[in-house]
Swiss-Prot record:
Organism: Pseudomonas syringae pv. tomato (strain ATCC BAA-871 / DC3000)
GO terms (BP aspect): response to zinc ion
Lineage: Bacteria, Pseudomonadati, Pseudomonadota, Gammaproteobacteria, Pseudomonadales
EC code: 7.2.2.20
Keywords from the named record: ATP-binding, Cell inner membrane, Cell membrane, Ion transport, Membrane, Nucleotide-binding, Translocase, Transport, Zinc, Zinc transport
Catalytic activity of the protein: Zn(2+)(out) + ATP(in) + H2O(in) = Zn(2+)(in) + ADP(in) + phosphate(in) + H(+)(in)
UniProt protein name: Zinc import ATP-binding protein ZnuC
Keyword set includes Protein transport: no
Main location: membrane
Any GO MF annotation of the entry: ATP binding
Gene of this entry: znuC
This protein's record includes keyword Cell inner membrane: yes
Amino acid sequence: MAEALIRLEQVAVTLSGQSVLDNIQLSVRPGEIVTLIGPNGAGKTTLVRAVLGLLKPDSGTVWRKPKLRVGYMPQKLHVDQTLPLSVLRFLRLVPGVDRVAAQSALEEVGAEKVIDSPLQGISGGEMQRVLLARALLRKPELLVLDEPVQGVDVAGQAELYSLITRLRDRHQCGVLMVSHDLHLVMSTTDQVVCLNRHVCCSGHPEQVSHDPAFVELFGKNAQSLAIYHHHHDHAHDLHGAVVNDAPTASPPHTHVHGDSCKHG
């Protein structure tokens, strides 16, 4: 098995006296896609900051492969409407990038036609592809994608997930993908990690649903997607603490708990 690109061991973070992350164990290897899901306040943004080296944990370790090249795709980009910034000028903010390199990256994500467009004038789907192209310009060994389908319609989401899979296959980079409440998860995702300040559960996503309506909606892309049904045998209160009186209306489901879980 390939050596991990990044490995988090017993990572804990406290902000303003409140525990945000507790005993997090996580690793991403070359060619592996890890999808991180969880509700608002689960600590996903904090975890991404720790992975990127922007935040030092209060305890635990974040190990990175020496000289690891990371490409980061933010959830969204706010650009002042009065700022004269074209897609090309935006991409050239990455050191060493010229028009040829920018054009090549845009072609790789299927957005070459917008190279001279004002950044403020492109669609949500085009913006996500431009942000992905920018991440690729760093020739990353690890791609960190923060809600890459933000602001994209359902059909566009399928296309973007398919694109991310192809990029992983082509570059053999590791991918850490973050979602707020992801129902559509790629069938090629190697691991799904459910976070709510600690790792609630982790494992492989379920196989693609054969529901005719689902197949009809996604067409040829349907087979590259799966529906991940997110179930717990425990519940959290409003502060993220585990409570034992989880609803029992749904049948039990088997899943793997993280090492940090203090419940069965």
